[in-house]
Amino acid sequence: MATQNDIPNSTPEDLAKQVEIAEKHPDPPAMPSRLPDSLKTLEAKIDTSKITDEEVANVHRFQRACDYLAASLIFLSNGLYTGGDLEEKDIKTRLLGHWGTCPGLSIVYSHCNRIINKYDLNMLFVVGPGHGAPAILSALFLEDSLGPFYPRYQFTKEGLNNLINTFSLPGGFPSHVNAEVPGAIHEGGELGYALSVSYGAVLDRPDLIVTCVVGDGEAETGPTATSWHAHKFLDPAESGAVIPVLELNGYKISERTIYGCMDDSELLSLFSGFGYEVAIVNDTPDQNRVMAATMDWAVERIHDIQHRARVNREEIKPRWPMIILRTPKGKGCPKYLNGKFLEGTFRAHQVPLKLARTDTNQRNLLKDWLNSYNCQDFLDEHGLPTKGITEHLPPREKRMGQRHETYNSYLPLKVPDWKKYGVKKGETTSATSVVGQYLDELLVTNDSTLRIFSPDELESNKLDGALKHSYRTMQTDPELMAKRGRVTEVLSEHLCQGFMQGYTLTGRTAIFPSYEAFMTIVVSMLVQYSKFLKMGLETGWHGKFGSLNYVTSSTWARQEHNGFSHQSPRFITTMLSLKPGVSRVYFPPDANCFLATVARCMKSENTINLMVSSKNPQPAYLSVEEAEHHCKAGASVWKFASTDNGENPDVVIAGVGNEIMFEVVKAAEMLQNDIPELRVRVINVTDLMVLSSLHPHGMNPAEFDSLFTKDRHVHFNYHGYVMDLKALLFDRIQGTRVTMEGYREEGTTTTPFNMMMCNNTSRYHVARMALQHALHNPTVAVNCNMLCAKYAWKLEEIENYIMENKDDPPEIYAAPVFKNKTSTL
């Protein structure tokens, strides 16, 4: 136990010394904490005695070459610089890119190549600081991983010059890692997601290791903060492993990082508490020797943990290895510029010499910088790597830029027949409960290619049938450890999304169920993923992607008990804003349609699917066969609820959404009883995108007109925001003959039917709109005013009942009944 004597006291003299150091050093060490010195015993003990001088020289040579090319990508416009004066024309007119993180990335990449060779590893490289693309592209060129995908970047002088001259310019690679970069499974622009994506990638891939570099700026983000716990959902018996490397260079764009201001005791206690065994590699003259030994240690610790779980069948709570790598920000660039520190400060974050094209002094500094790498030691006269680099690269199929898992590993699911789970037409049941049983079989049938990730909401959304033959995956829970679970529940939507992305981008398929209102937490991650998906599909060399599958339940319509904060369909808006080619939005109206939709989504490729359904009991409007036909069409006339099967209607009422459609059907029932002379066509839209003229699922004009007529008024009762529906229908239907209601941002803690009333989506609102737009029918014209008044009074009566009884009238949820109806779809 630590004593008071173990805790250092900061005297005024100590503080003054720290200030003096800070003034003389570009990146002063962190001020000492008041933690016990004994915490430093938590640091892993690394043996460097087995690392040879040749190994150190090899990785250092690769780093120099990588840094030299990275700087060239940022600055040069006329190919590789091999000596002599630099002229203005040799410098790009626009200097773009980020140098600060590049040296750290080249260090880690070079050491990954070394351990791939030494241990015959299957390894991926995930880059959190994706703005370090110059280093990654340089490493990929040096290992000849660009040429196989891009002929213009072949392993030749011309290919290298093309890479340099076009970087971050039209026609070249962007300044951040993205789907166009071979080996990438992570969009590198927005920070925070690298670690969770890495852990998702190794699930169900027992022979895969991902080295994930997390920048110390990125480590400040919320998603990264929770991702440090991701290893706790990793079963070492069935999955691979991640080596997290915290690249601690001390600075963000313009100030110090939180982690850069933490001393060793603080870092060791923090990450040890997260469950890691931590090794710190400092910026010393012997850094490469220590880093080599540390990477060896990390791999051997991983293999030991996996052996104990797989061979010895031990149920263990492992401490996975983690590395903290300290490097000066922008290591290698000029130390000073205009009397201020450059190397080792935030000034080296992006382009250290911003005026290199027009300022002679800065151009000379750049020349000295490039010459400092002594490129003649590792590049030939054509700028290509010489002996000393090429022979130490991994075999081609093992190179991190050519791993098939990153671009050509999609494994289609085996999708069982959903019909055996279908419910009898007219039966009232929870659609999610039925689908939960189907998910169970899907997980059993695809026991290494399908997973569910949920923020502790599976049971709440009545999908717990998925757990019949599976378990949850938390390995630190003694009741769940080593159970080979397929369902990960962690109360972090960001972590669920990251897991799903990593799992999907390495060839598998995932499902993400959540409350409708809280799915918006991952909106930014979804948008970034959609960009990755779009660019990946446009490369021409990327294979198929598995689908991302979102299931939102506990919708606004039935979150009356939790209140306004739980009522939001905004995630739908985001889905509709994505590129039409990748986005799918489904509103299955009953259990059978939900089953058919899940089966369809499980077979889909290259898409992002959203399924919106209710967990509360609803009638099954359609038989199994009818549901199958309806879902294939995406929208259809519900003849059983329409007048004369929907022929020659006076008005069309359409529903989009589960609870919403119930109100449409009840409105049709009510109108049939109150004014049978009104000819109503009832339509359900289950695939929202069929309404769009721009979407691959969109109906052609003839199909649209046949369904919604050419001249009759159409009223939509819509689950989401009306503005979204208006955008879909903008060029489809004349504005004067369409009305629509949807969620109006009205809600509170109330009753389910009151939610419908306050958002104008109740059966009475639908019926009034139908009457008011069918006045060409003489009978309707005569009776419209009376019936509309009746429905208005009924709404007031129900509102009074709710306020008095704190519940909806019991008859509200009676299943609809239509007279003399035998027609089917």
UniProtKB/Swiss-Prot annotation:
Cofactor(s) for this UniProt protein: thiamine diphosphate
Cellular compartments per GO CC: cytosol; nucleus
GO molecular function: aldehyde-lyase activity
Enzyme class: lyase
Keywords, alphabetical: Lyase, Thiamine pyrophosphate
PROSITE patterns found in the cross-reference section: PHOSPHOKETOLASE_1, PHOSPHOKETOLASE_2
Family: Belongs to the XFP family.
GO terms under biological process: carbohydrate metabolic process
Documented EC number(s): 4.1.2.-
Taxonomy, superkingdom: Eukaryota
Name the UniProt record assigns to this protein: Probable phosphoketolase
InterPro entries named in the record: THDP-binding, Transketo_C/PFOR_II, Xul5P/Fru6P_PKetolase, Xul5P/Fru6P_PKetolase_C, Xul5P/Fru6P_PKetolase_CS, Xul5P/Fru6P_PKetolase_N, Xul5P/Fru6P_PKetolase_ThDP_BS
Pfam family of the protein (one): XFP
